[in-house]
């Protein structure tokens, strides 16, 4: 969770003209970087046809450092035989814990426990959770395996992780033990012990806007928790339902109509998680009816995000396949209502966004997914499926309170009853989000793999955005996966007070000299503390800021 910044701090933060002046060319006084970027990555066995362990990469992320952008360390995972969901399900035998995890989520910021900083990387396919001591990013001990698939009795498919007030971690599990439906939440302590498993499925939910792929109409049963956010002051945990894991693991095309996707948001009382979700909300379908049902606006709610300031109680959610951003002004209301406020486009891959700490901007990664020649590619406007980051100014939307005018855009329907064209991002009301800036991340690798920027991390001390161009690819498992990978680059941008997103050209690959750091390393490359293991797939990122020795850190009034 990001912390609020004061108006004074915001006033001196980066502008496009001042970036060079605000980043001194010299390194820190002691020659050591003060900011690092942790990258949770899996081995990309397709380059050398050899499966190497998954790992945590550490990139120098201090703009003042002479090694800025260089991979300066890696951390290994504990290798425990037969510690993988594949073993538990009888799909494989002897799989060690440090391979075939499919590196996915970890906590968004390091957690401090007894003076040490920890990240908890988790495997989407292995259902393993590791704990990495990143207190000294240049000297990270082997990350122990703290939670295995066998410790969790009901669920599998690990996704998001947040910290609770009691310092426990709450984890979303996308599916059931056999990677079908339903999923749930699991609470663990910092030692990895399972405290409780919470069912997300609850019969009697709202009727799905149309029956699911398998004909289910009760959304209460279609629990696929993926995105998650938490507001301690409101006492709520909010989760979004993405997809039945088995239906996306066997995908044969990015636009496969057989994907069984989620269309609901679940609201939980943090003090009574064992009671299950208190509210289940079906997001609206809008006026568009796509010929491919999985590209309708609500399909595949990948992420959910809450506003931060006390005066705001809003929630956003975004659909990966539907390509749409939704907003509800008060998630604590008895029956929250979401509205479609920004339509990127069908199949555009609206991914894991963040709301800035001051509630000023929403930064949305657009993975694009569709590529030239695919059905619906750039159907509605030029650049619809460009891979990019978008900064949306949400001030007027939040200021409108419950009296929101912004809504879904108009559409042109064809004689077959399906949408021919979507006219704009929304209805153009005065309170609609306004695009303040964007950063194009198109590349041959992104188009060829039907991927793009999926996850972003924010350094709230410098207002920098790091983006990973990778989603999920399951070729090491003998599965087609999501058919949406990425070019495996990690890119850096500055967010200015005006909402501009400016690529940091100094954050460049140490081998090629090109902007962005490529994890597709040649087999000749010697990874620090790892060896010559070739290319890797970066999914999640987290900034690590070394403690300020003065002990001072300015925070705002969170009013």
Regions of interest found by a model, annotated:
Residues 29-33, 88-115, 157-166, 218-235, ...:
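Structural signature of eukaryotic scaffold interfaces centered on beta-propeller domains
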Residues 36-51, 172-183, 239-262, 364-385, ...:
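Short, conserved, GDST-rich strand-edge loop motifs in beta-rich repeat architectures
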Residues 58-67, 131-141, 189-195, 256, ...:
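Short loop/turn segments immediately following beta-strands, especially the blade-tip
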Residues 134-232, 241-252, 263, 291:
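Asp-box/WD-like beta-propeller blade repeats and closely related beta-sheet repeat scaffolds
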């Amino acid at each position: 969770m990001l912390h609020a910044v004061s108006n004074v701090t915001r006033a001196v933060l980066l502008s496009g003209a001042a970036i060079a002046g605000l980043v001194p060319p010299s390194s820190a006084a002691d020659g050591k970087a003060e900011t690092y970027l942790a990258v949770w990555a899996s081995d990309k066995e397709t380059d050398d046809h050899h499966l190497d362990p998954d790992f945590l990469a550490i990139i120098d992320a201090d703009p003042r450092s002479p090694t800025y952008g260089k991979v300066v360390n890696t951390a290994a995972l504990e290798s425990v035989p037969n510690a993988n969901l594949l073993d538990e399900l009888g799909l494989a035998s002897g799989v060690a814990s440090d391979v075939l995890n499919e590196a996915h989520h970890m906590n968004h910021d390091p957690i401090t426990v007894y003076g040490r900083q920890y990240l908890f990387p988790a495997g989407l396919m292995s259902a393993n959770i590791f704990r990495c001591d990143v207190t000294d990013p240049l000297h990270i001990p082997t990350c122990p395996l703290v939670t295995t698939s066998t410790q969790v009795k009901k669920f599998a498919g690990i996704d998001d992780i947040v910290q609770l007030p009691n310092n426990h971690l709450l984890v979303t599990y996308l599916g059931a033990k056999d990677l079908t439906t339903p999923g749930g939440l699991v609470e663990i302590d910092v030692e990895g012990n399972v405290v409780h498993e919470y069912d997300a499925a609850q019969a009697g939910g709202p009727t799905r806007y149309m029956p699911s792929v398998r004909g289910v109409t009760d959304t209460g049963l279609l629990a696929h928790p993926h995105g998650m956010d938490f507001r301690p002051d409101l006492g709520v945990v909010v989760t979004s339902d993405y997809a039945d894991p088995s239906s996306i693991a066997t995908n044969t095309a990015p636009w496969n109509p057989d994907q069984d996707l989620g269309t609901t948001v679940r609201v939980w009382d943090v003090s009574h998680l064992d009671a299950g979700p208190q509210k289940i909300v079906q997001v609206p379908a809008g006026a568009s009816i796509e010929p491919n049902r999985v590209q309708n606006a609500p399909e595949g709610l990948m992420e959910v995000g809450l506003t931060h300031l006390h005066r705001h109680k809003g929630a956003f959610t975004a659909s990966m396949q539907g390509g749409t951003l939704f907003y509800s002004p008060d998630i604590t209301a008895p029956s929250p209502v979401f509205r479609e406020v920004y339509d990127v486009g069908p199949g555009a891959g609206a991914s894991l966004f963040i709301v800035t700490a001051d509630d000023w901007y929403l930064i949305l990664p657009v993975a694009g997914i569709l590529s030239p020649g695919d059905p619906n590619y750039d159907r509605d406007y030029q650049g619809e499926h460009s891979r990019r980051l978008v900064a949306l100014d949400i001030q007027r939307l939040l200021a409108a309170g419950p009296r929101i005018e912004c809504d879904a855009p108009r559409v042109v329907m064809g004689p077959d009853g399906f949408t021919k064209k979507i006219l704009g991002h929304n209805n153009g009301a005065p309170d609609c989000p306004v695009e303040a800036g964007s950063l194009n991340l198109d590349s041959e690798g992104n188009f060829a793999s039907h991927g793009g920027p999926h996850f972003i991390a924010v350094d709230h001390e410098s207002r920098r955005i790091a983006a990973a161009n990778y989603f999920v690819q399951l070729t090491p498992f003998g599965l087609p996966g999501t058919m949406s990978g990425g070019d495996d680059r990690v890119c850096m941008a500055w967010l200015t007070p005006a909402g501009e997103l400016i690529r940091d050209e100094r954050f460049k690959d140490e081998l090629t000299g090109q902007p962005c750091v490529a994890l597709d390393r040649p087999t000749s490359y010697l990874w620090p503390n790892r060896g010559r293991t070739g290319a890797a797939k970066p999914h999640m990122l987290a900034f690590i800021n070394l403690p300020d020795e003065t002990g001072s850190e300015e925070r705002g009034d969170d009013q």
